[in-house]
Amino acid sequence: MAEVGEIIEGCRLPVLRRNQDNEDEWPLAEILSVKDISGRKLFYVHYIDFNKRLDEWVTHERLDLKKIQFPKKEAKTPTKNGLPGSRPGSPEREVKRKVEVVSPATPVPSETAPASVFPQNGAARRAVAAQPGRKRKSNCLGTDEDSQDSSDGIPSAPRMTGSLVSDRSHDDIVTRMKNIECIELGRHRLKPWYFSPYPQELTTLPVLYLCEFCLKYGRSLKCLQRHLTKCDLRHPPGNEIYRKGTISFFEIDGRKNKSYSQNLCLLAKCFLDHKTLYYDTDPFLFYVMTEYDCKGFHIVGYFSKEKESTEDYNVACILTLPPYQRRGYGKLLIEFSYELSKVEGKTGTPEKPLSDLGLLSYRSYWSQTILEILMGLKSESGERPQITINEISEITSIKKEDVISTLQYLNLINYYKGQYILTLSEDIVDGHERAMLKRLLRIDSKCLHFTPKDWSKRGKW
């Protein structure tokens, strides 16, 4: 059995952790770093095939030294600080880009052919049929719900102009480790999931204090209290373009409010692993969702979008802060992004790759929105109601490729007597109705006060 002193960076061994059911388990983990505090060694571990947000510092008592695997010196991959350059099998290291090609045996309905209701052996409660059209290639999201990343096509070169861009080239030993222990934001204390490039001198602090209105950071509670006596903001900068009840949205220009935008990106990076932070926020707009009480407008989440997108992206980054997750706010952010696209008269899609949580939220939103349209179709003169994929896209502002991939994901497309039938089974309908009963938060278009700008005519934004 190995000794504690023999453990080095790059070793792999089982590590004790508690799972979601509060049961002990011993998953395989990799040692990313070792540090000594007052003669006591601590080991920073990444659990193989688990999300990086679960990485943590552990003591030697949680390590199974009998099954340790030392790094191989003859590894062909270049190493850095004793670590292999890649981790096959770790989902956050492998950017999964799945492309499902529809073969002649599994055709997709034409975008413009009308659809109509069609019964199927009495088992279907509602059905929509589309006339056969040309076969097309469909770029679909992957179907693994635990996947960290997803794409709808061949990856393009990383953009180097945004505030948060998709790029793994800086994924080294430093950025693989969480560097902020805890963040105090208003009445919440947040435990970061990932690395964020805050100034080095702040990474040794037990708590990083943020002003919840301007997002400036301080070293201590005293610094924050001193700042609050001078900060007169009680809401994000920019224009309030939506308010209903306690929920508001503020539109923030990344050029006009550069400091706030950069601070927002630093905070967001603590909870987004698939993006690399850059400081050029000028080409971006930020839409911050807040919850109002007597003390002000408290940030709940946000999404950003490019002022000019050549690829129809209506979201660049999207995040609901951890204290507000699993409460319907993520779907509300997504719904708001499509509401803006409707006002702009465009269809939109989120920038890929999506995080695992983002992918789940988008799949759920697309499914509910499309099913809502299909189930609301009315028949005329006793005939089956008809609709095309283009019409679904125009009504919802969801890009056609996302409409098709969602229909495939829900397994609604069937070929029957020369027609493409979209069949809604009892299970699909019942599941949708149950989900909609739980979806209490919705965007009210009448409460939106938004005038889109033509950024192509505004020079350098």
Swiss-Prot record:
Oligomer and partners: Component of the NuA4 histone acetyltransferase complex which contains the catalytic subunit KAT5/TIP60 and the subunits EP400, TRRAP/PAF400, BRD8/SMAP, EPC1, DMAP1/DNMAP1, RUVBL1/TIP49, RUVBL2, ING3, actin, ACTL6A/BAF53A, MORF4L1/MRG15, MORF4L2/MRGX, MRGBP, YEATS4/GAS41, VPS72/YL1 and MEAF6. KAT5/TIP60, EPC1, and ING3 together constitute a minimal HAT complex termed Piccolo NuA4. The NuA4 complex interacts with MYC. Interacts with ATM. Interacts with JADE1. Interacts with PLA2G4A/CPLA2, EDNRA and HDAC7. Interacts with the cytoplasmic tail of APP and APBB1/FE65.
Phosphoserine: residues bearing it: S86, S90, S147
Organism listed in the record: Pongo abelii (Sumatran orangutan)
Catalysed reaction equations from the record: L-lysyl-[histone] + acetyl-CoA = N(6)-acetyl-L-lysyl-[histone] + CoA + H(+); L-lysyl-[protein] + acetyl-CoA = N(6)-acetyl-L-lysyl-[protein] + CoA + H(+); (2E)-butenoyl-CoA + L-lysyl-[protein] = N(6)-(2E)-butenoyl-L-lysyl-[protein] + CoA + H(+); 2-hydroxyisobutanoyl-CoA + L-lysyl-[protein] = N(6)-(2-hydroxyisobutanoyl)-L-lysyl-[protein] + CoA + H(+)
InterPro entries tied to this protein: Acyl_CoA_acyltransferase (IPR016181), Chromo-like_dom_sf (IPR016197), Chromo/chromo_shadow_dom (IPR000953), HAT_MYST-type (IPR002717), MYST_HAT (IPR050603), Tudor-knot (IPR025995), WH-like_DNA-bd_sf (IPR036388), Zf-MYST (IPR040706)
Chain positions covered by the region annotation Disordered: 70-168
Compositionally skewed regions (Basic and acidic residues) per UniProt: 90-100
Function: Catalytic subunit of the NuA4 histone acetyltransferase complex, a multiprotein complex involved in transcriptional activation of select genes principally by acetylation of nucleosomal histones H2A and H4. Histone acetylation alters nucleosome-DNA interactions and promotes interaction of the modified histones with other proteins which positively regulate transcription.
Name this protein carries in UniProt: Histone acetyltransferase KAT5
Region (Interaction with ATF2): 316-461
